[in-house]
């Protein structure tokens, strides 16, 4: 078919058709029937226009080739075959100069004699069927429709055929010749049938008996039969319907649906202001672990015992000093709180038997840090409803923050591999059914790709901290309990390892409602010098507490060890979700599964093994200012997991709003990329609802920045 097209049609038409297909992401070498159809349609449009001019008296005349036509105006403006943006510019210009209503879809021609747009159709089916489809789609009085078939039939709006008999005969003869040429090469049948490419499997089935009766009973009101309903659905064009419904609602509502073009969307406006700060409940890439390998001490597995053993592995403690104060806090209290923790751990070690839990003495620095007695007294509303000046607290508007580079670094780090495994392969019984075998295989491949990922470490750390904090909040409501921040993993050699990140001290926790807040002070070890990115640590008071000797390629190096201290808070509902962070593994596995399913349905066999074992193939991971980033399937697994984990770590109303609203714009852009000619109304309102979520949250700002990169590259 491709050879036939290149021989049969003018090279200029072939070139235009190739350009059009490439603009829509289609390949002329693969979709050869479509290639032929586009060339045929373009040739008919050009033949429709050929030799037709308007003379100085405004009359339509035909000028044969060779006759002088230099001073005459072309009767038809050809819109078909132009670049999409140029075509809309031409249409807009015609509408502005002639006053003709703007069409919703790009027409093929404009007739300066009759002052109307023309939609040309070339069909391999019945002309009246194709005419109805076109009319249903366009739903416009302004656009005139003219349909030709390969059998010599034609149909036009109000039987007004625009051109003289001879011009139309020339087009019909050319179409008949194309058909004969195709038939002689054995191409016609395939070409004729390919126009019904929209038919679905069920249309080929004859629905009879009970199923037919059920189908007829299930129809919406006002439809007499299944065929009747199908015809309506096939011809349904939602944009015009929505416009009509809106105009019925109120005279004030005037939602003109505008075509959404490549030039329509603008980037999201990110807020200006000081850089955003770290707001996760625990340190991520900056965390430092004190660890013990192959723990076998007495009481192994009891958090306090494990913590004491980990603390004993470090010998570089020194007198703590404040290196980065908290702007608004009483920093000396944070310093004293750490000293108290050290002293009380020393007391534990001095005891003959280590207690299972440790409640801190309620010293004034700890009371201050945990907000003890800071909450205003609650008074029953009935006791104060007569107070004349009763009002809600004045609360400040949130301060706008700008995107800072640290959050992208955090995300990149979360996608990386560590040298430890954070997931135990849970034992599930023998597979019984074939589908179970496929599911197990997928789970095992996926687990192998993500078990060493840093995002998986964050999951296990989050699950541990939230579980311990919720337990303590319920079991010791009035106590300032000391909770070690612990995780467990396996080394490359398979040895068990217990890690200590730092400590949490829980405040009073009489949590009646899901949203009641428990305050806690977190104290976390780190080797990151806070003075490198002070804006990231706005909420922290940071102490220097020791020197750690590290082995490097050039020998041993001493690095200062810091303690990141801050007051924080959480609620029962947040801790409940934190305990269920393992769900992130399931979510990302399901996303990978849908990719495997898509590949398998194309190849008509299960592609799990090939999908994971073909190391040479790369997959799209995400957008960056450089373009579409690609990587191995393992990198895709880890990136999807990291996104899911960050959605959990940085969960907020801003993220909820941004995700819901930006998804609408994303779907519109996807529709444009899929050549579905989307229309929109109140696009400004959609942008407003997205941008009102861009305030100060680092993860939301990063997602907005990624969204802008996507817009740039998706609409090239």
Curated annotation (Swiss-Prot):
Report the main location listed first in the record: host cell
Q: Which GO terms describe its biological process?
A: cap snatching; DNA-templated transcription; symbiont-mediated suppression of host gene expression; symbiont-mediated suppression of host mRNA transcription via inhibition of RNA polymerase II activity; viral RNA genome replication; viral translational frameshifting
> What stretch of residues is annotated with the motif Nuclear localization signal 1 (NLS1)?
124-139
Q: Which GO terms describe its molecular function?
A: endonuclease activity; metal ion binding; RNA binding
Q: A single Pfam family, by name?
A: Flu_PA
Q: Which GO terms describe its cellular component?
A: host cell cytoplasm; host cell nucleus
Q: How is it modified after translation?
A: Phosphorylated on serines and threonines by host kinases, including human casein kinase II.
Q: How is the cofactor bound?
A: Binds 2 manganese ions per subunit.
Alphabetic keyword roster: Cap snatching, Endonuclease, Eukaryotic host gene expression shutoff by virus, Eukaryotic host transcription shutoff by virus, Host cytoplasm, Host gene expression shutoff by virus, Host nucleus, Host-virus interaction, Hydrolase, Inhibition of host RNA polymerase II by virus, Manganese, Metal-binding, Nuclease, Phosphoprotein
Query: What are its E.C. numbers?
Result: 3.1.-.-
Q: Where is this motif: Nuclear localization signal 2 (NLS2)?
A: 184-247
Residue numbers binding Mn(2+) 2: 80, 108
Question: What cofactor(s) does the depicted protein rely on?
Answer: Mn(2+)
Q: Where in the cell is it found?
A: Host cytoplasm; Host nucleus
Locate the residues binding Mn(2+) 1: 41, 108, 119-120
Query: Which family, according to the similarity comment?
Result: Belongs to the influenza viruses PA family.
Q: Which HAMAP family match?
A: INFV_PA
**Which proteins does it associate with, and in what oligomeric form?**
Influenza RNA polymerase is composed of three subunits: PB1, PB2 and PA. Interacts (via C-terminus) with PB1 (via N-terminus).
Q: What does this protein do?
A: Plays an essential role in viral RNA transcription and replication by forming the heterotrimeric polymerase complex together with PB1 and PB2 subunits. The complex transcribes viral mRNAs by using a unique mechanism called cap-snatching. It consists in the hijacking and cleavage of host capped pre-mRNAs. These short capped RNAs are then used as primers for viral mRNAs. The PB2 subunit is responsible for the binding of the 5' cap of cellular pre-mRNAs which are subsequently cleaved after 10-13 nucleotides by the PA subunit that carries the endonuclease activity.
The name under which this protein is listed is: Polymerase acidic protein
Q: Which organism is it from?
A: Influenza A virus (strain A/Swine/Wisconsin/1/1961 H1N1)
Q: What is the lineage of its organism?
A: Viruses, Riboviria, Orthornavirae, Negarnaviricota, Polyploviricotina
Q: Which gene encodes it?
A: PA
């Amino acid at each position: 078919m491709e050879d036939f097209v290149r021989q049969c049609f003018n090279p200029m038409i072939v070139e235009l058709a190739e350009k059009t297909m490439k603009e829509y992401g289609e390949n002329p070498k693969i979709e050869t029937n479509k290639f032929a159809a586009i060339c045929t349609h373009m040739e008919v449009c050009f033949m429709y226009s050929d030799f037709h001019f308007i003379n100085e008296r405004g009359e339509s005349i035909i000028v044969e080739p060779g006759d002088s036509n230099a001073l005459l105006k072309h009767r038809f403006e050809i819109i078909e075959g132009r670049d999409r943006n140029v075509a809309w510019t031409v249409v807009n210009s015609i509408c502005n100069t002639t006053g003709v209503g703007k069409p919703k879809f790009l027409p093929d021609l404009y007739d300066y004699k009759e002052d109307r747009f023309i939609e040309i159709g070339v069909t391999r089916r019945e002309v009246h069927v194709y005419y109805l489809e076109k009319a249903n789609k366009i739903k416009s009085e302004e656009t005139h429709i003219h349909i030709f078939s390969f059998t010599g039939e034609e149909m036009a709006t109000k039987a007004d055929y625009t051109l003289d008999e001879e011009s139309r005969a020339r087009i019909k003869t050319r179409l008949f010749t194309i058909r004969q040429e195709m038939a002689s090469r054995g191409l016609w049948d395939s070409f004729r049938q390919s126009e019904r490419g929209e038919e679905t499997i069920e249309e080929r089935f004859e629905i009879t008996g009970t199923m037919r009766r059920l189908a007829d009973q299930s129809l919406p009101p006002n439809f007499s039969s299944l065929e009747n309903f199908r015809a309506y659905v096939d011809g349904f064009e939602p944009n015009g319907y929505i416009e009509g419904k809106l105009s019925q609602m109120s005279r004030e509502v005037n939602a003109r649906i505008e075509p959404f073009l490549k030039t329509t969307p603008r980037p999201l406006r990110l807020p200006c202001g000081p850089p955003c700060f770290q707001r996760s409940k625990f340190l991520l890439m900056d965390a430092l672990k004190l660890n013990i390998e192959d723990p076998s001490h007495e009481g192994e597995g009891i958090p306090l015992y494990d913590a004491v053993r980990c603390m004993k592995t470090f010998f570089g403690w020194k007198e703590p000093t404040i290196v980065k104060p908290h702007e608004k806090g009483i920093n000396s209290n944070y310093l004293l709180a750490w000293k108290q923790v050290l002293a009380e751990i020393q007391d534990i070690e001095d005891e003959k038997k280590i207690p299972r839990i440790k409640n801190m003495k309620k010293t004034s620095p700890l009371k201050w840090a945990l907000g003890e007695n800071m909450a205003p007294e609650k008074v029953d509303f009935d006791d104060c409803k007569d107070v004349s000046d009763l009002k809600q607290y004045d609360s400040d508007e949130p301060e706008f923050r700008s995107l800072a580079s640290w959050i992208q670094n955090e995300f990149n780090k979360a996608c990386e591999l560590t040298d430890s495994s954070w997931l135990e392969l849970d034992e599930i019984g023998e597979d019984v059914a074939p589908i179970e075998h496929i599911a197990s295989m997928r789970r095992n491949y996926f687990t192998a790709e993500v078990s060493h990922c840093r995002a998986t470490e964050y999951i296990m750390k989050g699950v541990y901290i939230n579980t311990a904090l919720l337990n303590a909040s319920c079991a010791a409501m009035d106590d300032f309990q000391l909770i070690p921040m612990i995780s467990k993993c396996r080394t490359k050699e398979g040895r068990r390892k217990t890690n200590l990140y730092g400590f949490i001290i829980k405040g009073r926790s009489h949590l009646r409602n899901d949203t009641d807040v428990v305050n806690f002070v977190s104290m976390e070890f780190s080797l990151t010098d806070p003075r490198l990115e002070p804006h990231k640590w706005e909420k922290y008071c940071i102490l220097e507490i020791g020197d750690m000797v590290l082995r490097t390629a050039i020998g041993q190096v001493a690095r200062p060890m810091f303690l990141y201290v801050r007051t924080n808070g959480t609620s029962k509902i947040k801790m409940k979700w934190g305990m269920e962070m393992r769900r992130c593994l399931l979510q990302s596995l399901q996303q990978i599964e849908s990719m495997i399913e898509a590949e398998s349905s194309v190849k008509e066999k299960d592609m799990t093994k090939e999908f994971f074992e073909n190391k040479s193939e790369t997959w799209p991971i995400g957008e960056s200012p450089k373009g579409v980033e690609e990587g191995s399937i393992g990198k895709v697994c880890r990136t999807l997991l990291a996104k899911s984990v960050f959605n959990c770590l940085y969960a907020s109303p801003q993220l909820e709003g941004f995700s819901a609203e930006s998804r609408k714009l994303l779907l519109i852009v996807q529709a444009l990329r899929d050549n579905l000619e989307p229309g929109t109304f109140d696009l400004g309102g959609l942008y407003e609802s997205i941008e009102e979520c861009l305030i100060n949250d680092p993860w939301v700002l990063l997602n907005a920045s990624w969204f802008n990169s996507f817009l740039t590259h998706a609409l090239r």
